[in-house]
Regions:
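Short beta-strand-to-loop acidic/aromatic patch adjacent to the donor-nucleotide binding site
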Residues: 240-252
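Active-site beta-to-alpha loop of glycosyltransferases that engages the nucleotide-sugar donor
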Residues: 138, 142-159, 163, 173-175
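C-terminal accessory extensions appended to soluble enzyme cores
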Residues: 61-65, 313-418
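Short, acidic, metal-binding catalytic loop of nucleotide-sugar glycosyltransferases
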Residues: 157-167, 171-175, 183-187, 192
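Conserved catalytic core of nucleotide-sugar-dependent glycosyltransferases
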Residues: 251-351, 355-356
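Juxtamembrane luminal stem/stalk of type II transmembrane Golgi/ER carbohydrate-processing enzymes
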Residues: 3-4, 8, 28-141, 380-418
Length: 418
């Protein structure tokens, strides 16, 4: 036991340094120290058992039960505690997501509204299929988004809706949701959107820059921007009875969905819009899990939100293309800027070659498990997203300009660095 204690004392500074790294979250150095600790533990055990082996003398065999000596328990704890801390620190989120079906319950199911559409079918007939009636004139439509850096997706969205929307209301901030200063991407690229000039209502939100070495609460900053959108909508001239689309930039309602809401009477005052979810491009369809976008018949108490507001959802109403960027640097920006930036657990998550490989594989950028409430769905969605060769039923502008948007179509997974 004396030899064991002496060996432990020689390596104790290494353990102490490692624990301090965990406390200070110096992630890159932690993984180097894990290797060193493992080597130290091996040397410690070898020294201990070798000394015990040397001191052993032949003894008659005794078939009696002996309690495990305290020194053996000490060795087990010496190994178990740091390894457990590393495992929890590194894989805690993944472990939590794996056991989510045991500790969390799914939200109440939506009441799905059937959605009918085909080309060259009259609006009167489409309204009646939904048990609505056609209007004598269309409602005005306001499309309101909080913008970050998705310039390509923004153009596809506005081209899809341009003929139907009265005002495009866009709010951008000079900081990210995590309090990092950022350029005004839309303001510096307005000439690209000259086709919508006259319909654009744009404003800048003065964000709060985080103190050096800290981060602002991303959800609090996001909430403040959504509150600022309410005032901007009033400035845009929205009135009672107008249609208001609330969604993120990459949640794109289809033009025929907006036209249906614009021309039909009897629609629900609030409904969610179900979008087909894609990851990285339209080559990787995930499922129909995107539900946060909403369509409102505006009234004075309508507030801009991105959470569940009703049990009604209109099926197959558009597209949600997450992380659909042209350049690798745009992926890096979003990974560190948006509300879930805490998912970047290691610096190598932002490595350009790693990101490029994961895009082409359809695998998760954050090395996370799917957020599911049953083990059946969890196992079904684990691993890379199967790629698709279909580019049917996508935004018209995307297909018309396929050469410029090859990175969003099947077979175009390679990205340029910047």
């Amino acid at each position: 036991m004396i030899e064991l204690k002496r060996s432990f004392c020689r390596h104790f500074p290494l353990y102490s340094h490692f624990l301090m790294l965990l406390i200070n979250s110096n992630i890159d150095v932690v993984f180097i120290q894990v290797t060193e600790i493992g080597r130290a533990l091996i040397f410690l055990l070898v020294e201990y058992f070798f000394s015990k082996f040397q001191s052993m003398a032949p003894r008659p065999l005794r078939l009696t039960y002996r309690r495990p000596p305290p020194r053996f328990l000490f060795i087990i704890l010496l190994i178990f505690i740091p390894v457990s801390m590393v495992g929890i620190f590194t894989y805690g989120q993944k472990i939590s997501y794996f056991f989510r079906p045991l500790w969390d319950n799914p939200p109440p199911p939506f009441k799905r509204l059937s959605h009918y559409y085909a080309e060259n079918v009259s609006m009167d007939h489409l309204c009646r299929l939904h048990d609505w009636s056609v209007r004598s004139e269309p409602r005005q439509v306001y499309d309101a988004i909080i913008f970050s850096n998705e310039l390509d997706i923004l153009e596809i969205r506005w081209r899809e809706l341009h003929s139907l929307v009265t005002k495009f209301v866009i709010l951008e901030s000079n900081t990210t949701f995590t309090g990092i200063p950022k350029p005004l991407f839309f303001a510096s690229n307005q000439t690209r959107f000259a086709f919508a000039e006259g319909k654009i209502v744009h404003d800048v939100f003065s964000g709060q820059i985080a103190a050096h070495g800290s981060r602002e609460d991303p959800f609090a900053l996001e909430s403040k921007q959504r509150a600022a959108m309410n005032g901007l909508l009033q400035l845009a001239g929205i009135s009672n009875g107008d249609i208001l689309i609330m969604s993120d930039t990459d949640e794109i309602p289809s033009s025929h969905t907006v036209k249906l809401l614009q021309w039909c009477d009897g629609i629900p005052p609030v409904m969610h819009l179900e979008f087909r979810h894609y990851m990285y491009s339209f080559e990787f369809p995930v499922d129909y899990s995107s539900w946060r976008a909403t369509a409102h018949v505006f009234h004075p108490r309508t507030l801009y939100r991105h959470s569940r507001q009703t049990d009604l959802i209109l099926s197959d109403a558009g597209w949600h293309c997450s992380f659909c960027f042209r350049h690798i640097q745009e992926f890096v920006f979003k990974m560190t800027a948006y509300s879930h930036a805490d998912r970047v657990k290691r610096r190598d998550f932002l490595d350009h070659s790693r990101i490029q490989n994961l895009i082409c594989q359809g695998d998760d950028l954050f090395d996370m498990l799917p957020e599911e409430y049953t083990f059946q769905e969890l196992f079904k969605k684990m691993g890379p997203i199967p790629s698709s060769c279909s580019a049917v039923h996508l935004p018209a502008y995307l297909i018309e300009n396929a050469d410029n948007y090859r990175f969003l179509l099947p077979g175009g997974c390679l990205r340029s660095p910047e």
